[in-house]
């Protein structure tokens, strides 16, 4: 007879959202059980191998558990996070997994059980009471579906969606009018089985990567045709010569008969095996084309599921079953206000702002046959492209007609089109934190999730003692500012006053900023690199030269110091709003000194402090 465990909160799934939810619920005092399929926690950030997260990269958006995770990464990876060009934060996935494991160990009221998948949902009328696993059952006051594919939604017969919606349903401009070849071939976005390769160095001969049983190298022809081989490899470069292989252009995305993921166990395993072979085939192709100095990395992932430590424990899933919730996030809910940089705040029928998490990723869809045309939601900020900001409403986490359940992964109530922006790791981590906080509050107050006042949840997130989380996106307000909490509360209570610019009114004394502002992110030495780069003292963080303005929010610096790379021109980018403001208002072709970290893959300087003379500012009429 299987044992019965009881908890206040049960989290099923140890991915990005589930791990955050379990940690947050336990930190709030709820007796929490976390059941995961895999031996690593973190999902997309770790066990799926995508250790180069996208979105919420701006300093103002690095809050909550996402911000805490970045701080831990900076401390535990002393070589720095500036390795690849696809992300500002590239790290060894083993470090990410260790962070989550350590956080869980610190919580005596959080019981983590790994190696189990849900088998059945225990339900009474329209209320979820718990979940049955192979060897045990967990009964809980609140259950959270944090599985990668929304398994509890199917097992519990909770209303959900899978696949495309057409224009008539939500009025989304980017949705197709009717079924077509793309919607029928790829009902959801293609997953990717990430691999980690190793650059063993000039003259080295790595072990040969065997071709898998299913191998067709023609699928990868021209995969990096618009890039140099070095640019291709540097896309997901990690420390220690590691290379994350998650390439979207004729690479290792795999979507053939992707419906098998929600079919029988046999059909699901068939898809997973083919996806793994497809990724192995791509790494074989890379080695064949670029040489034997590149091979599969050793001892990265546990081998419980793939038998090869270079391949992630499971695919990077971009889409899941999606809840039919109280609120559904549509494309128009993530797009910026006309002429603005942010989406409207979600306001319910009672006029209450429902925002509980933030995101800013530009909508991005992956289909092996090519991309679709999507409404633009990108802006220039900090010398580069980023996404316009949006929020996740609390109602998207709550089933329309089922109690005792919250969702906190890619299974939230969102359209297929809008999922392309809400699915990213930092946003899902924010969603998980909000769901975990909501679950703990429901236990404390003896209520169902739909009965919890959203303003109570917002306040708890804003005032969390260990990882306070922003719920209103404000580009120019970082968490270290004294009036951060006041401004967050102001727009929660007065959502109609939320500025289309995403900037709240600030009074900034420029004299404090010029040459005196301290770095928000620690200066870290990068150590030795294994790609071809100029000689540069890694301890050197000061760069001087002539400032160039090449267009709107497009900056460069032709260096005069350090001498080892003098006369070279580097892009200037920043994640800091005060530095962004200084660069906007600095005159072109004037001398400029910045404190920055170099990214050799992207050929940019990530600026965290500016020293300049008042004469360098543009004069405003």
Description of each model-found segment:
Residues 4-6, 24, 30-31, 35-120, ...:
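Conserved N-terminal/central alpha/beta ligand/cofactor-binding core
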Residues 521, 527, 533-534, 539:
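Short, low-complexity intrinsically disordered segments enriched in A/P/G/S/L with frequent Arg
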Residues 18:
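N-terminal Rossmann-fold NAD(P) dinucleotide-binding loop
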Residues 44, 136-142, 146-519, 537-542, ...:
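Flavin (FAD/FMN)-binding glycine-rich loop and adjacent Rossmann-like elements that form
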Residues 122-137:
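Conserved beta-strand-loop-beta-strand element in the redox core of flavoprotein oxidoreductases
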Residues 522, 538-553:
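Structural detector for short beta-strands of small beta-barrel domains
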Residues 551-575:
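OB-fold (S1/OB) nucleic-acid-binding surfaces
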Residues 3-15:
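Beta1/beta-strand and adjacent pyrophosphate-binding region of the FAD-binding site
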């Amino acid at each position: 007879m299987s044992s019965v465990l009881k908890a206040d909160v049960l989290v099923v799934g140890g991915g990005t959202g589930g791990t955050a939810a379990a940690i947050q619920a336990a930190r709030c005092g709820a007796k929490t059980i976390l059941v995961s399929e895999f031996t690593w926690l973190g999902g997309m950030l770790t066990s799926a191998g995508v250790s180069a997260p996208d979105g919420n990269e701006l300093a103002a958006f690095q809050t909550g558990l996402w911000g805490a995770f970045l701080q831990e990464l900076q401390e535990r990876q002393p070589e720095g996070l500036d390795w690849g060009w696809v992300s500002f934060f590239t790290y060894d996935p083993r470090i990410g997994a260790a962070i989550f494991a350590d956080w869980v160990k610190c919580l005596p009221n959080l019981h983590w059980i790994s190696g189990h998948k849900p088998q059945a949902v225990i339900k009474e009328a329209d209320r979820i009471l718990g979940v049955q696993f192979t060897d045990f059952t967990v009964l809980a006051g609140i259950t959270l579906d944090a599985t990668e594919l929304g398994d509890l939604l199917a097992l519990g017969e909770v209303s959900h969606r899978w696949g495309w919606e057409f224009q008539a349903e939500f009025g989304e401009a980017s949705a197709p009018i009717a079924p077509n070849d793309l919607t029928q071939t790829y009902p959801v976005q293609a997953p990717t089985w990430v691999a980690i390769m190793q650059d063993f160095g000039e003259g080295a001969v790595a072990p040969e990567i065997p071709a898998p049983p299913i191998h067709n190298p023609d699928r990868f022809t021209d995969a990096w045709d618009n890039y140099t081989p070095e640019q291709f490899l540097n896309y997901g470069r990690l420390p220690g010569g590691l290379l994350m292989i998650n390439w979207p252009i004729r690479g290792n995305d795999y979507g053939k008969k992707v419906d098998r993921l929600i079919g029988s166990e046999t059909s699901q395993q068939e898809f997973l095996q083919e996806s793994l072979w497809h990724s192995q085939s791509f790494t074989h192709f890379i080695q064949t084309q670029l040489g034997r100095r590149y091979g599969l990395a050793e001892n990265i992932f546990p081998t419980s599921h793939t038998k090869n430590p270079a391949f992630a424990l499971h695919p990077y899933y971009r889409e899941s079953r999606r809840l039919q919730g109280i609120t559904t996030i549509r494309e128009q809910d993530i797009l910026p206000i006309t002429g603005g940089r942010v989406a409207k705040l979600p306001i319910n029928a009672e006029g209450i702002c429902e925002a509980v998490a933030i995101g800013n990723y530009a909508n991005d869809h992956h289909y092996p046959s090519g991309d679709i045309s999507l409404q633009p939601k990108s802006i220039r900020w900090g010398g580069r492209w980023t996404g316009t900001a949006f929020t996740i409403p609390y109602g998207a986490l709550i089933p329309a007609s089922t109690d005792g359940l919250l969702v906190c992964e890619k299974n939230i109530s969102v359209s297929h089109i809008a999922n392309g922006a809400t699915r990213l790791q930092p946003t899902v981590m924010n969603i998980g934190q909000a769901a975990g906080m909501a679950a703990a509050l429901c236990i404390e107050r003896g209520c169902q999730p739909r009965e919890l006042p959203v303003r109570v949840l917002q306040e708890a997130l804003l005032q969390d003692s260990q990882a306070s989380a922003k719920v209103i996106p404000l580009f120019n307000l970082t968490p270290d500012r004294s009036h951060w909490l006041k401004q967050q509360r102001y727009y929660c209570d007065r959502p109609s006053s939320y500025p289309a610019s995403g900037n709240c009114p600030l009074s900034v004394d420029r004299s404090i900023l010029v040459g005196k502002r301290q770095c928000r992110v620690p200066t870290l030495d990068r150590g030795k690199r294994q790609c071809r780069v100029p000689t540069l003292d890694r301890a050197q963080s000061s760069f001087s030269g002539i400032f160039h303005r090449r267009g709107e929010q497009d900056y460069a610096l032709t260096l005069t110091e350090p001498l080892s790379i003098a006369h070279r021109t580097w892009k200037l980018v920043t994640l800091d709003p005060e530095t962004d403001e200084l660069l906007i208002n600095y005159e072109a072709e004037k001398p400029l000194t910045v404190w920055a970290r170099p990214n050799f893959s992207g050929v940019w300087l990530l600026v965290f402090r500016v020293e300049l003379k008042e004469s360098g500012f543009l004069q405003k009429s």
